[in-house]
Amino acid sequence: IIFMGTPEFSIPALRALSSKHEVLSVYTQSPKKKSRGQKIIKSPIHLEAEKLKIPVRFPDKLKNEDEYKFIKESNAKLVIVVAYGQIIPTEFLNIKNLIFLNVHASLLPKWRGAAPIQRSIMEMEKETGISIMKIVPKLDTGPYMMQKSVSINEKDNHFSLSKKLSEVAAKLILDALLIFEKKEIVFKDQDEKLATYAQKIDKKESEIDWNTPAKKLIAKINGLSPYPGVWFKHNGKRIKIIEAEISEKQGKMGEVITDDLVIGCQDKAIKINLLQKEGKTILKTKSFLAGYKIVKGDMLI
């Protein structure tokens, strides 16, 4: 097996695989330079693979002769991709006797694309899940072999739902390998008529719009929390809302209705419970207000 992945989300799957199977090599995105002091940061999967003593490859572009040759000559039967962050070149997909499987965080054909976890929360879905699918040249359109649904509760945010899904993915990939070893693999085509697309999160989506129903606003805050987050401006400073809930109070859109940060929106209001100033730690409202002044009657933009 060859494994391809990059973020925290991919770690449970790699751990599960390496505990039961031989992982020949791990591919991940190349280390990034952090602006402060130009420190080089390896991806979470890079660090995990080193702990597991699995060789790591991190080409800037997967599409090159060396990587093609390496994968072709590795004699791997399977390449498992979990949030790698690069498109698999078609010539790789055409290597004989090698199957590329992708672990996608939605119940395909719903939420194909880059941000399925965020979009499912933002659209107030009640459930999402994991799909294990065959990779084909057109993104997220390949036939799937397994799916498992995961319920989304009202308190779930991007972080908590990602954690749930990553653990389900790890178990499901082991089940998929059992089927693969027994040669009982059956792929089902996706129904194109049901396909929806989870577009990449745009920076603009992080700006708050108080002219939004409270329920929809909470869904957006949860979907983008903790990163990139939804922020408002107060006295020129950007403040990120990490957690909030619906309040039945009424007020003008963007107006601070009470001293414990209940803010008016299109229909009702939201009460902010956790927030964060740029570059600072996340604080509960009470602690935040002890060091930063926002008072009843202020307008937040």
Regions found by a protein language model. Give the residues of each.
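Acyl-group handling in specialized metabolite and lipid biosynthesis
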Residues: 199-212
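Short beta->alpha connector loops
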Residues: 6-9, 60-63, 84-86, 224, ...
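Donor/substrate-binding cores of folate-linked one-carbon enzymes
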Residues: 18-19, 29, 78-197, 204
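Internal alpha/beta domain cores that form substrate/cofactor-binding pockets in large enzymes
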Residues: 24-25, 55-74, 87-105
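N-terminal Rossmann-like dinucleotide-binding module
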Residues: 1-37
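N-terminal glycine-/serine-/threonine-rich beta1-alpha1-beta2 phosphate-ribose binding loop
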Residues: 33-77
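An anion-binding loop in the catalytic cleft
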Residues: 211-301
